[in-house]
Amino acid sequence: MQYKDENGVNEPSRRRLLKVIGALALAGSCPVAHAQKTQSAPGTLSPDARNEKQPFYGEHQAGILTPQQAAMMLVAFDVLASDKADLERLFRLLTQRFAFLTQGGAAPETPNPRLPPLDSGILGGYIAPDNLTITLSVGHSLFDERFGLAPQMPKKLQKMTRFPNDSLDAALCHGDVLLQICANTQDTVIHALRDIIKHTPDLLSVRWKREGFISDHAARSKGKETPINLLGFKDGTANPDSQNDKLMQKVVWVTADQQEPAWTIGGSYQAVRLIQFRVEFWDRTPLKEQQTIFGRDKQTGAPLGMQHEHDVPDYASDPEGKVIALDSHIRLANPRTAESESSLMLRRGYSYSLGVTNSGQLDMGLLFVCYQHDLEKGFLTVQKRLNGEALEEYVKPIGGGYFFALPGVKDANDYFGSALLRV
């Protein structure tokens, strides 16, 4: 049975059925593997690449300021927990699994071959960290009546509604929680997802999933090379410097002076958009028109009329848009005015390719992800400026949602959402 919500998005009725299915699937707990064996030499993309690791504990979660890895997955879940105590059990369990998976170790051995194996085995006997990050975010729906958390909802968190060019599919929208899983290689990302699902059959049910990628050489540059999207343009050139701590406090992280609930400090608002590209149509569009639409040179990434990718466009000297069109993507997204300074955000997008659509068109596009300290000042303001841009003819947002990336786990005695659940 389906109903239409107030935003005009078809929503399937799920939770009650999924709760029953999840409970039936739970056969027993799977222990965390603590012991580390001497590591063998697994195959690597480059020397020691599989041994790269990001710290798990800290004020902020990894996977936000972390230089983009080559492989990525977005997975939204419905939470099946029945009460606040169950939700705490989920967050504690996710903390344990993330801590182990991101740091690596020996795969757990199955003591009885008559039982299911404790690990999928797809990474072999040693689970290398492989630069894995798993970023946990919560959606607007987690703050409904189920867990009594409504008074603690981040002030700017809201359900994603349609923009004029959207064609949203309810099956690809929203979620109680969202995992952004990134690593050097796709098998590590898949292993992490399967591990988490195996440990949470009565607590989580997958709502939607999308896998993304950037080129390996862009990933290996550790942020020095801008990834190229499937329209052939560099994606993320105008990002603020993620290594500038003072700037990140201003742009990305929720701080104490924002009058948000105290538990949100150190977290970040996350906007996710699944954007389908009309690549066949785009590939038949003249180069000059493509560059006019974006406002950049396709090969170098430089603003039109300039030489280098990171040159700052001078819109004041081009008030009529003769060089960079007034409706170009870069000019609308960031007009470079004093007023637009407050709408800066950190983009962390990935390409996707899924085969073909029902109409026989290539199903390719962008998994747009951005982080900001204020959702309304950041993504929502930028997207409103982009409404009606020339690029809309070639792109179609089909899903996604707005989420809040939780603050980091401080140490081994802490867990995700601890400050939220203790209120």
Curated annotation (Swiss-Prot):
<dbReference type="InterPro" id="IPR048327">
    <property type="entry name" value="Dyp_perox_N"/>
</dbReference>
<keyword id="KW-0574">Periplasm</keyword>
<feature type="binding site">
    <location>
        <position position="347"/>
    </location>
    <ligand>
        <name>heme b</name>
    </ligand>
</feature>
<feature type="binding site" description="proximal binding residue">
    <location>
        <position position="329"/>
    </location>
    <ligand>
        <name>heme b</name>
    </ligand>
</feature>
<dbReference type="GO" id="GO:0005829">
    <property type="term" value="C:cytosol"/>
</dbReference>
<dbReference type="GO" id="GO:0006974">
    <property type="term" value="P:DNA damage response"/>
</dbReference>
<dbReference type="GO" id="GO:0030288">
    <property type="term" value="C:outer membrane-bounded periplasmic space"/>
</dbReference>
<keyword id="KW-0479">Metal-binding</keyword>
<dbReference type="GO" id="GO:0004601">
    <property type="term" value="F:peroxidase activity"/>
</dbReference>
<dbReference type="Pfam" id="PF04261">
    <property type="entry name" value="Dyp_perox_N"/>
</dbReference>
<keyword id="KW-0732">Signal</keyword>
<dbReference type="GO" id="GO:0020037">
    <property type="term" value="F:heme binding"/>
</dbReference>
<feature type="binding site">
    <location>
        <begin position="236"/>
        <end position="238"/>
    </location>
    <ligand>
        <name>heme b</name>
    </ligand>
</feature>
<keyword id="KW-0349">Heme</keyword>
<dbReference type="GO" id="GO:0042597">
    <property type="term" value="C:periplasmic space"/>
</dbReference>
<dbReference type="InterPro" id="IPR006311">
    <property type="entry name" value="TAT_signal"/>
</dbReference>
<comment type="similarity">
    <text>Belongs to the DyP-type peroxidase family. EfeB subfamily.</text>
</comment>
<keyword id="KW-0456">Lyase</keyword>
<keyword id="KW-0560">Oxidoreductase</keyword>
<feature type="binding site">
    <location>
        <position position="296"/>
    </location>
    <ligand>
        <name>protoporphyrin IX</name>
    </ligand>
</feature>
<comment type="function">
    <text>Involved in the recovery of exogenous heme iron. Extracts iron from heme while preserving the protoporphyrin ring intact. Also displays peroxidase activity on guaiacol in vitro.</text>
</comment>
<dbReference type="GO" id="GO:0004325">
    <property type="term" value="F:ferrochelatase activity"/>
</dbReference>
<keyword id="KW-0408">Iron</keyword>
<feature type="signal peptide" description="Tat-type signal">
    <location>
        <begin position="1"/>
        <end position="35"/>
    </location>
</feature>
<dbReference type="InterPro" id="IPR006313">
    <property type="entry name" value="EfeB/EfeN"/>
</dbReference>
<dbReference type="GO" id="GO:0033212">
    <property type="term" value="P:iron import into cell"/>
</dbReference>
<dbReference type="InterPro" id="IPR048328">
    <property type="entry name" value="Dyp_perox_C"/>
</dbReference>
<protein>
    <recommendedName>
        <fullName>Deferrochelatase</fullName>
        <ecNumber>4.98.1.1</ecNumber>
        <ecNumber>1.11.1.-</ecNumber>
    </recommendedName>
</protein>
<feature type="binding site">
    <location>
        <begin position="236"/>
        <end position="238"/>
    </location>
    <ligand>
        <name>protoporphyrin IX</name>
    </ligand>
</feature>
<dbReference type="Pfam" id="PF20628">
    <property type="entry name" value="Dyp_perox_C"/>
</dbReference>
<dbReference type="InterPro" id="IPR011008">
    <property type="entry name" value="Dimeric_a/b-barrel"/>
</dbReference>
<dbReference type="GO" id="GO:0046872">
    <property type="term" value="F:metal ion binding"/>
</dbReference>
<comment type="subunit">
    <text>Homodimer. Part of a ferrous iron transporter composed of EfeU, EfeO and EfeB. However, this EfeUOB tripartite iron transporter is defective in E.coli strain K12 due to a frameshift mutation in EfeU.</text>
</comment>
<feature type="binding site">
    <location>
        <begin position="334"/>
        <end position="336"/>
    </location>
    <ligand>
        <name>heme b</name>
    </ligand>
</feature>
<dbReference type="InterPro" id="IPR006314">
    <property type="entry name" value="Dyp_peroxidase"/>
</dbReference>
<keyword id="KW-0575">Peroxidase</keyword>
